[in-house]
Amino acid sequence: MELYYLSAKEITEKIKAKEISAVEVAKATFDRIEAVEPKIQAYVTVTRELGLKMAREVDEKIARGEDPGPLAGVPVAIKDNMSTAGIRTTCSSKILENYIPPYDATVVEKLKEAGAVFTGKTNLDEFAMGSSTENSRFFPTRNPWDLERVPGGSSGGSAASVAAGEAVVALGSDTGGSIRQPAAFCGIVGLKPTYGAVSRYGLVAFASSLDQIGPFARTVEDAALLLNVIAGHDPKDSTSADIEYPDYLSFLNQDIKGLKIGLPKEYFIDGIDAGVKKAIDDAIKVLESLGAVFEEVSLPHTKYSLPVYYLIAPAEASSNLARYDGVRYGYRDFEAEDVVEMFSRTRAEGFGAEVKRRIMLGTYALSAGYYDAYYLKALKVRTLIKEDFDRAFTKVDLLLTPTTPTPAFKFGEKTSDPVSMYLSDIFTMAVNLAGLPGISVPAGFDGHLPVSFQLIGKPFDEGTLLKVAHAFEQNTEFHKARPKL
């Protein structure tokens, strides 16, 4: 097996046992990036020099007999909406194209302390607004399984980098499905933790009540390993939960016999691709054979999650993105004759079409006369969506649904119809609205394209999701498949 396709656990074990060096793994990964990146375009910035320096530091620590950390020598990609001191952080937008932050996000600090090796910053839909990575200012990222298709979004670069062997694990952010949907399209594991479980300090805000950082990995074990590193209370994030966080790896080999899994009838609807439906049915059979018990549940307000999301998220975005005005940092139009013209021209030239669409929509929803009719009503329905989940969890331990209605779609297929694009996140949005954890797990193929299922858990019960996902993974072979590049 090529070094870049080893799991994070295998890499740390081999490096600590001195079977391989961190520098060897880093070189193999950067060589892989050089070889396949022209096809995939997962990265906005590749940090080869920094990565090799970090790898050398791991090897030096081991030589001195020091503990190199739980991610010793593991190549990690970081979505380009997380602050990295001294490394360009663009959000794939013209407005931040040359922005170099002076500080690290909390998750980035934690990765450094854990001995990770940074491969670079990955491409995304501009300001994380999109479902296909076609909204990037720079270029679209391609799906490693089919270069004519999207990798999903908004964390498409992170998902594609892990699937293509350009990183071993990666960080993404998930506001309405932006980790789980690209993980499904690229055939890897993607976990959105409970809101508040991972610090948002240093994550460029899109919708602050929905955003959450989480891991991409090729195995459930690697996702648990990365979650161990990034989860935890952070006083710099006022929404960070001050609770005891478990060792997520300790859940992996637990028995799932007798676990009750709910199947929400509102998620098994017309419009689901036949290949996705078959993969879900097969996954249910595997979990039943391991002793899990299934029952139908109802989440009646699910049907409102799309309109609720597209009122709340743009409303928060319109407020958060007001800071990009050309005054303090980022792009500025120097041709303007006065400050008002400078504001308007900077924003008109700096933001792409989808970002402008959402700023307009959010500003409208928050404006006088419409605030109560739209935004306030959406907040009330959000509460009803959350209460549906609370009721379901009195009967079952977790829920199983499709992650996406279809496998990855072709470039340009949905760009002219925003609502059709938004519908690709129809099964993931409610999880963000309710602040719950969700994981996308590879469940097979529809032709040559990966398909997945989603597990949704109670707040801060990532352990149960990881336990069930790992049990499924250990009894199937889907996670071992690799794209031919």
Swiss-Prot record:
Name this protein carries in UniProt: Glutamyl-tRNA(Gln) amidotransferase subunit A
Function of the molecule: Allows the formation of correctly charged Gln-tRNA(Gln) through the transamidation of misacylated Glu-tRNA(Gln) in organisms which lack glutaminyl-tRNA synthetase. The reaction takes place in the presence of glutamine and ATP through an activated gamma-phospho-Glu-tRNA(Gln).
PROSITE patterns: AMIDASES
Family: Belongs to the amidase family. GatA subfamily.
Gene: gatA
Keywords: ATP-binding, Ligase, Nucleotide-binding, Protein biosynthesis
Catalytic residue list: 79 (charge relay system), 154 (charge relay system), 178 (acyl-ester intermediate)
GO CC, alphabetical: glutamyl-tRNA(Gln) amidotransferase complex
Keyword Calcium: no
Source organism per UniProt: Carboxydothermus hydrogenoformans (strain ATCC BAA-161 / DSM 6008 / Z-2901)
